[in-house]
């Protein structure tokens, strides 16, 4: 009898939960329409893979790319709409969140054509790769719009789980297995640290989980200046730091970059930073509103360590991917300057603008590395010597992307850094901006060192890898070079295009 009553209660509770979920999806589904497009694309991929043969492989790429482009289109049509909070306060839709979602979708859209030839040559499983990329993109998009602690924890876990699987996709590669193990262990540790920080916020605010309600709860409980908030700030900064990979939370980055498949590294190097930056701005700016001095100091320390260590250690690297790993650590230091400045002096606008340029510069560089690696099988910087004599197009493309990463005028990276540093200078971050300028000069040194190798024509310096280099005969049909051309053009945009980009970015306020 008791079992029967308990069974009936379980059925009633399950029905209520299902009806509530259906009600939320029915009335709030329009607020996540771009995400729904990706979910539909995921389902379609699974259906086609389970019912088709190898001849339908082009359809898998087409569906993935189309769903991403349609999701971007849906975001653009929703631009400038009034900010809305949906799903019982769990998700927020506004211009600020949507521009970060756009950046993530743009990264994924460029990464798929970059991966096609690599997947074919290495005989990787295609469907699973595309599923993981789309699911990680979905997790990143939900993280950008997350408005409560639970969603902020679950969304990056969705992204991280796919990242672990992608980094270990080449199971027979010992370096890939080692990288995945380190990535998984450190990712699990950082997630536990992050949720511990959330628990301090939850308790201090009187049991609130929504970001704005946490602020109100801290005021009501008079806990906004308590030691518990400082503890929460430290734990949350460490947890988010793993996603952003600033120093000293960067230990996993070089190994994962070196051991993972190159298209996976290209995808992770930008999407993880974009999603984590969007989440960091909201977490630091809203729940820690009363602790702005403390988190400014913490981020300044992280930025200084990242810019100095990242760029100095990059000089000593012999692997191209490890060099870019340490370079990315330095780049995130520049991005943190924009987070510290905030809205007051256009910090968020400068950060968004620089991240847009960083996407094109970084993906363009990785497209060149993928193309060179498939034809030579090497990743050593010395093996790039004399590439200009065999493939001038690839050498010039790589040189332009590296120069843009270094911030040389008149390339896009120069104007992105200039605007970012100027906003920091106006906000009074003189020491931080000075460190940024000095480390940018250091980065130009090791980028120019690689470019000098590319352009050398002396036979004694040209390695056998370049002597035996086979140039691609059909450029128009090469998807890697399609991504490369798009990224190189975007990386060399002159300063005349800065004003409209900054104007759009300045509209992305909370």
Curated annotation (Swiss-Prot):
Location within or outside the cell: Plastid, Chloroplast thylakoid membrane
GO biological process, one term: ATP synthesis coupled electron transport
EC number: 7.1.1.-
A Pfam family of this chain: Proton_antipo_M
Keyword Chloroplast applies: yes
Principal subcellular localisation of the protein: plastid
The entry's keywords: Chloroplast, Membrane, NAD, NADP, Plastid, Plastoquinone, Quinone, Thylakoid, Translocase, Transmembrane, Transmembrane helix, Transport
Membrane topology classification: Multi-pass membrane protein
NCBIfam families according to UniProt: NDH_I_N (TIGR01770), PRK02504.1 (NF002701)
Protein's name in the database: NAD(P)H-quinone oxidoreductase subunit 2 A, chloroplastic
Source organism (scientific name): Vitis vinifera
């Amino acid at each position: 009898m008791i079992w029967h009553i308990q069974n009936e209660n379980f059925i009633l509770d399950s029905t209520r939960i299902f009806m509530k979920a259906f009600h939320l999806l029915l009335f709030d589904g329009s607020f996540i329409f771009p995400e729904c497009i990706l979910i539909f694309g995921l389902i379609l991929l699974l259906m086609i893979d389970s019912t088709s043969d190898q001849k339908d492989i082009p359809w898998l790429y087409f569906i993935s790319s189309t769903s991403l482009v349609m999701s971007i289109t849906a975001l653009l049509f929703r631009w400038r709409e009034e900010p809305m909070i949906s799903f019982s306060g769990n998700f927020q839709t506004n211009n600020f969140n949507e521009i970060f979602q756009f950046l993530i979708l743009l990264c994924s859209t460029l990464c798929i054509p970059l991966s096609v030839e690599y997947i074919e040559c290495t005989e990787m499983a295609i469907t699973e790769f595309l599923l993981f990329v789309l699911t990680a993109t979905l997790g990143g998009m939900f993280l950008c719009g997350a408005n409560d602690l639970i969603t902020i924890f679950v969304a990056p876990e969705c992204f991280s789980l796919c990242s672990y699987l992608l980094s270990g996709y080449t199971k027979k590669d010992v370096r890939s297995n080692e990288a995945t193990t380190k990535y998984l262990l450190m990712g699990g540790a950082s997630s536990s640290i992050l949720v511990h920080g959330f628990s301090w916020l939850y308790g201090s605010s009187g049991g609130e989980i929504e970001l704005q309600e946490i602020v109100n709860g801290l005021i009501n409980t008079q806990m906004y200046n308590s030691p518990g908030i400082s503890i929460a700030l430290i734990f949350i900064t460490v947890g988010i730091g793993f996603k952003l990979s600033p120093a000293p939370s960067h230990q996993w980055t070089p190994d994962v970059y070196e051991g993972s498949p190159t298209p996976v590294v290209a995808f992770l190097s930008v999407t993880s930073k974009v999603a984590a930056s969007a989440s960091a701005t909201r977490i630091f700016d809203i729940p820690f509103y009363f602790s702005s001095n403390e988190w400014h100091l913490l981020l300044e320390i992280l930025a200084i360590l990242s810019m100095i260590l990242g760029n100095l250690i990059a000089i000593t690297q012999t692997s191209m991917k490890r060099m870019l790993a340490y370079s990315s650590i330095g780049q995130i230091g520049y991005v943190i300057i924009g987070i510290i400045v905030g809205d007051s002096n256009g910090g968020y606008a400068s950060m968004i603008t620089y991240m847009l340029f960083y996407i094109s510069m970084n993906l363009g560089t990785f497209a060149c590395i993928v193309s060179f690696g498939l034809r030579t099988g090497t990743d050593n910087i010395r093996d790039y010597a004399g590439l200009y004599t065999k493939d001038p197009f690839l050498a010039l493309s790589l040189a332009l992307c590296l120069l843009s990463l270094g911030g040389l005028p008149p390339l896009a990276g120069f104007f992105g850094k200039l605007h970012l540093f100027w906003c920091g200078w106006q906000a009074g971050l003189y020491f931080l901006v000075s460190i940024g300028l000095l480390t940018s000069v250091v980065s130009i040194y090791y980028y120019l060192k690689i470019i000098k190798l590319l352009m050398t024509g002396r036979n004694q310096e040209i390695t056998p890898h370049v002597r035996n280099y086979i140039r691609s005969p059909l450029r128009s049909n090469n998807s890697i070079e399609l991504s490369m051309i798009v990224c190189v053009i975007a990386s060399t945009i002159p300063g005349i295009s800065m004003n409209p980009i900054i104007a759009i970015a300045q509209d992305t306020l909370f």
